[in-house]
Each structure stands twice: as C-alpha cells, then as structure tokens.
Amino acid sequence: MKRDIQVNDNIEEVKKEKGSLGKRILKGLGALGIYFLIFAAVITFCEIFLRFQISGKIIKMNLAFLAFVPAEAMFFAIFAGFFKNIGNKITLPILILIINIYYCVQFVYYRIFGSLFSVSMMGMGGTAVGNFFWAMEGVLIASIIFLTIFLAPTIICIFLSLVKKIKYPGYPILLHILPIFLTVGLWFAGIQGLKLIGTDRQSAYYVLTNNSSDTDTTANHLGTLATFIVESGAYYFGVGSGDNESTELVSVTKDDFELVADTPVQETVTETVEENASENDAQVEEVVEEIVYDPWIDERFDFAALAENTNDTAAKNMYTFLAEREPSYKNEYTGLFEGYNLIYICAEGFWSYACNEKVTPTLYKMQNNGIVLDNYYNSFLNTTTNGEFAFATSLWPDVSRWAMSGTDVGSFPQSAGKFMPYGLGDFFVENGVETYGFHNYYGTYYRRYLSWPNIGFENCKFMGDMKFTSTWPSSDLEMMEQSMDYYLENDRFMAYYMTFSGHGPYTSANYVARKNLDTVKELLGDELENYNNEAINYLASQYEVERSMNYLLERLEEAGKLDNTVIVMTGDHYPYYLSESGRTSLCQKEISELDQYHSTCMIYCAGLEEPIHCDEYCCNVDIVPTILNLFNIPFDSRLLMGTDVFSTDSMHTAMLYNKSFLNDKVEYNSTNHEAVWKIDTSVYCEEALDSYIKNYMALNDSYYLASINMMKYNFYLTIWKQSGLLTNEEIAAENQRAARAMEINAEQNEIEAEAERLKKEAGEAAAAEAAAQAAEEGVTE
C-alpha cells in the first residue's frame, strides 16, 4: 500500500515538473519574443536613421533591409536571457550598445570618407585611424548630436533599468538553441522573399547574390548590418564566391543599344531647285569619301582561337568576352603627340572647382586649353588607390565583397604580384622612353614601392628619398622641386606623379591649407565673402597644386621642352571631405548627386595653338587608351576596359564605381534606379527604354568583372603565355619576381602589425602610468 502511495507521489512530482517545465518554456518563449522585438526595433531605428543621414530620405528600394531584420534580431536574442534578472539586466544594454556602436562607426566613417566601411577594409583599420585621427577628431565633435541619437536605445534601456522595476527574465537552454535555427531559417526566408519580389539587375536579390556589388550599393538595398553579414560570409567563408549567373560575363554589342522608335518619325526633306536649270544640265552628286580607320588590335592575340582551345571555364569566358568586345579605332587625332614627353599626374582631391580664374589661374588656363574633355567624370567618390589604379591601367579596381583585405587593400597594391604588361609606363618603356614615378608620401603606403615599377614606372622616389616640411599632407611644390632634375635632361621622358597637398580635411588643422590661407583670401578679394571657411580652405589646399604647376611649366620652358611635353592631370576621386554646405559654397550653386562626379581631366600641351574640345562622355579608365592613341603607341584596345575618347565608331559612357552611368542619351543613377533621359522618349516604348538601361548595366558589370578577373586569375600572364609571347625563361623570371614581391609585402605587413602592437602597448602603459599617478596624487591629498 505504501509502495502504491509512493509511486503515485512520484507520478505527481513528474507531472508537476513537466507542468513547471512547460510553464518555464512558455514564459521563456514570451521573454524571447520580447527580446526579439526589442532588437528588431533597435536595428530598424538605426538603419532608418543612418539612411536619412546618408541620403536625406527613404525610398522604396531602401526598405528591402526589413527582410533581414527578423534574422538579425533573432541572432542577438540568442545571447539575451542567459541569466536571471540581474544578469539579463546588464546583458541587454550591452547587446544594444554593440548594435549602436556598429552604426556609430559606420556613420563616422561615412562622414569622413563619403561611403560606408567594408569588411575588406577592416585590415586597414589601424593604419586608417592613425593617418586620419586628426580629421576624425573634428568629425566626432561635429557629429556628437547624431551619435547621441544613435546611442539613444542604449541610453533609454539603461535609464529604464535604473528607474523602473522591470523584470528581465531568462529562459531554458533549449530556447537558446532554438533561436540559432530560427536565425538561419529567417535569413533564408528573407532571401526567398527578395527573390519573389524580383531578380533583375535592379533588384535587391541581384545585389545580394552578385558578389561584385560594392558596399554602398549593397547597403543601399539590403541595409548596413545585412551588408556586413553578406560581406563577412563572402570574405571569410567564401559564401557565394563560386560561379553564378549574376556575375557572368555578358557580351553586349552596339546593336543591343539601338533604340528603335515605337512609331515612325517623319522627316522633313527640303529640296532646292534652281529655277533656270535646263533639261540638259547634269546633276552632279558630291561624293564625300568616308575615311575608314583601323581598329587598335594586336594581331598576335586570337582570342576566339584561345577560347576554343581551353577547357578552363573562367578562361573561356574571358577569351570569349575579349573576342567579342568592341575595340577602339584610330582616328584623326592618332599620333597628334607622337614622340612627345608625358607628365601624368593623379592629383589628390582635385576637382573642376579647384580651377579658379582668380586663385589658381594656371590651373584655370590648363583646364580650358589643350584637349578639353567637356563630359569627363571621375568615377570614384573616395579611396585614392582606386582612382589611381583606373587612371594608370584602364582597369576597374575591385571594390566588391571579393576584395582582399590588409594594409595593402585594393587592386593597385595587389597588382604588384601580377603580370602587368599593360600598365601605362610599360608602353613607354617598350618604346625606349625612361619612366619615373614620384609621390610625396611613403612608398609603403598602398604598397606603391612594389606596384609602380610593375606597371612600368621604373625610377621611383617617395617620402624618405625626398624631404618635406610637413608629413601629412606634404607639399606638391616641394616634390616638384626635388623631382624634375631626375628627368628633365633626358631626350624623352615619361613621369608619373601622385600628389598629396589637396588632401582633406579642409580646416585650419590642414598644414597646406593653413599656410596658403592668407594668400588665397587676398586673391579672392571682393569675392571672399561668397565662400565659407571650408570652401576657402579647399582652394588653399589646391593652391599648392597651382604653385607646383607654375614651377613645372617654368622649368619645362627653361629646358626648351614645354611645347613638346603633354601634361595630363585629373583627381584621384571627388574631394569627399567637403560637406554639402562647403560644396555648395565652393561651386556657388547646389550640385546634384551625379554632378559631383563631373570633373576635369587636363590633357594640356602648350604647343597646341587652339583648344580641342571633346564632348564624348568618359571617365578615369578612358584616359590610358586616349593617351596611347594620341602618342600613336600600338596596343590592343580590347585588353583595356576604357575607350579612346576620339574613337568615332565606339560607344562612349562615363561609368561610376557603383555602376551608375552617363552618356549622350541618359543619366542613370543606380542608388535610386532613376533614369533622366536626354532624348524624346515619347517615340519609344517603355520596354525599349528599359532594355537599353539593362543592357548598359550588363555591359558595365562585364567590364568590372573582366577587370577583377585580370587580377584574380593573373590573366594577363595567361594570355601572354598561351599566345606564345613569353619564353620559359621569361615566365620563370616573372614568377620569381611576383613571389618575391609578395614576400616583401608579407614582411612589410608583419613590420606594420608589430609597430601597431608596440604603439598599442605604449598607449596602454602610458594610460596605466597616468592612472597610477592620479591615484597617488589623490592619496597624497
């Protein structure tokens, strides 16, 4: 009997335990739901507020980030509820703070650089912070209100925890495992949701699955946090790095861009008849013989045959693309500067509005004489190495989630370990011309001391080889004064410069701007009141470029080489340090998002009596093929992603880093998918116009992907080897050179990592010493 009672008691206890567990699970699910909603609200708030700070508005395409908020919120819910009330009371604000700090970092980075921080740039974080700390301080002070708003969820959470008796329940371990599966499930549900909405090139799904998408474009569609997750997956785990349709090279020809009118367009034909013409008068037709120009093609490259003879899929796709690519053609300006000298300048932060008739008259003269590219656009918003790479190689730099990281981040530094026979300097070396490269900062930065010689700039000098009054930024004039004697006595020369004086921020903290400020104010005279301090400081920084150009022209004239020397100069990127108010003040008008890319590329030669205007749309990658044509230097234009601006039988487009583009028919903004047409669209059906945009998007994607493949697969070496242009000895020598370059690069990475470590330790030691001293003083008192 007692045994039966004991069994019944045990059964009752089990039932109570089950009931208790069931209640705990139900309570836990309720707590999990609350934490989930809190994190979802925090992430949504931060995304919307950051988007407003970036673009000033939210449009439909920006809302795709909501597809991933459930997964992101569930991920953070995994770490909530681990403890009992007090522990969770501490954990929750910490988790919210982590989210808030992430968005604060993105906001500050955007305020400095004009774009969002990518995963591939993380390896450069320490170096960037070190070099830009003096700029960061001002941005942090100016952003204090916005940063406080970003931190508002954390502040509110802490406040409620202190003044309200709110319970912070935990939940069983089972409910910490469940959110892991829910996070994965919700993430894939978000992907499928985007897929249902649309998969074309303008869709969020395309941006998600296309690993060549840049950070800003991805964040514009998917949100900042989802972009970080997607980029981390691609970078650290290779997620999506395989072949897929969204990143396939597409062959698009000129025929695909023929806009056919939906309805016939009547043409008015005017006939002129002489009243007294007799019946016997012979009608004479004036026949204008059209000159047929040859394409810029190297007959040694048979890309169609190479495609047929390879079994490698990536190589076959590249060869097919190159075989079908429209070449540039020789034209009336071919050889205009044959035999001349070339000075090729990539100028830091240089923009059209740096050319001011009163402040920088030499720059203004050079801008409006020589060859004037009226529709030149600088493709890049920031990051010097990207604009520099495109300007010197006519390849697009990798700004995608494929991009490698490290201090040597970017295609230009990575090109040091690749075979680069089509760098600008290489062409002049092949023609027996001495080549030089000069930069007024350290050659280790962006690994220029490795990459420049590899694209043909054989004799390079950097900071250390030259002496400067200031380190950051240093003087362009001082660089010019120390460099010209190296080459000026040569019969022929090609000199490349990467300047530095124009670097921001454009405040009194800038050494170059500060030393030129009084001079610029005096030169502006009565117009001074029209400019705010930021605009004046920008002109003051560019005044150093003015001084360096004055010196350059004077020395060339003294040497009797001014008339047969071509000076090419453009900016590395838009001067992103300019705020909207500074930009408006400098331009004396408001500038649209696309207009800020409209810039100047000088092709100046004092020997030209009259300026030559070219109204074709063009950008950074188009300059190398244009120069090669002007100098009549043989090349295969299919291997360059730019087009000679004077090639009359070619399509001309200014493409931006985010795949926006402009030409004589349309301006397409990829950030909002808006197309502003310059033609009468009423005679075309909507389908034809839409097809035109999508074909251009496909072509631009292909140019970009082909450029990435050139670096990723070292494809120039593959082409030269399979075309029989290199001997076994030359191949072995190149492999040895590339391996040594990468060894040096790795050694430099270790040196800089060690320097960062020592710097950090020194800072921690100094802080500890200061704290100990303060404590000691407190005891003494």
Which residue ranges define each predicted feature?
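Extended, compositionally biased non-globular segments that define protein topology
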Residues: 1-148, 155-195
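Low-complexity, acidic Ser/Thr/Pro-rich repeat tracts that form intrinsically disordered stalk/linker regions
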Residues: 6-13, 266-285, 763-781
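Long, solvent-exposed N-terminal ectodomains of secreted or membrane-tethered precursors processed
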Residues: 43, 47, 88, 92, ...
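Hydrophobic alpha-helical transmembrane segments of multipass integral membrane proteins
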Residues: 97-104, 151, 681, 688-692
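Alpha-helical scaffold segments in carbohydrate-active enzymes
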Residues: 100, 202, 206, 573-576
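Catalytic cores of glycan-processing enzymes that make or break glycosidic bonds
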Residues: 141, 244, 338
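Membrane-interface segments at or immediately adjacent to transmembrane helices
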Residues: 189-330
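Solvent-exposed soluble domains appended to multi-pass membrane proteins
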Residues: 310-781
